[in-house]
Amino acid sequence: MSTQNYFIGIDIGGTKCAVTYGTDKMDILSHYQFATHTEKGPYFAIDEIKKCLAILEKSYDFTQLKSIGISCGGPLNSETGIILSPPNLPGWDDIPIVDIIKKATNKPTFIQNDANSCALAEWRFGAGRGYKNVVFLTFGTGLGAGLILDGKLYAGTNDNAGEVGHIRLNSNGPSGFNKSGSFEGYCSGSGIAKIAQIRAEEKLNIGQKLSYCESYDELQGITTLQLSKLANAGDADALEVFEISAKKLGYGLSVIIDI
């Protein structure tokens, strides 16, 4: 009889979602990924997750599946299993995701803030092994942190102890969480594009152009993907944007370390 433990991991992000089937030995047996498409509402992504689960149930023996873990940006309530209006998931208001997945699979299901989930995983299986204190940053559509303090996950009263994206690094600057100059405003996928938009508008206002934006009409079309491709090709204007973000990342990390 097999003694292997099998699990499903579900990650719900503002840009993409993922569903994996694996073991507690870090063997990933199946992995699915798809765009979240927040403009289509929460149940588009939820239905896609259900489709992935149905495929997995046909492919593997679910009697050996111990449980399902869901990782999602906060705020959320890990005790009730409800997603509570995350900034990067517009329309995901009071979504009982744990109950939905339980009904679809009849398996124990749990949810945790994405940054906390990542911190736990890295602490147990990755670069954080052997350390009593670990900070893990989620640098995606938004920015958050998971905290391992004195050998335990520190989630705080409402699972939001690591929401460092709110830290203000400058009185003015790109917005994150609708707060100008915030850590997330400078250091996130959406924030990097905002830095570029600000720099481009400053140049256009004095009659100059940047490689990634030659007119005011192009300002809102600037994307982080576009900038990363240019930066990888050595474009100086795009590299300047990433340098600004990188310096703020270092500054933000120094604040967390001091705390």
Q: Which residues are covered by each model-predicted region?
A:
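Short, active-site-adjacent cap segments at secondary-structure transitions
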Residues: 75-78, 117-119, 144
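Structural signature of FAD isoalloxazine-binding scaffolds in flavoprotein oxidoreductases
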Residues: 160-164
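Short hydrophobic alpha-helix segments
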Residues: 32-34, 87, 157
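Adenylate-forming
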Residues: 118-124, 147, 166-168
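General beta-strand structural signal in soluble alpha/beta enzymes
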Residues: 109-113
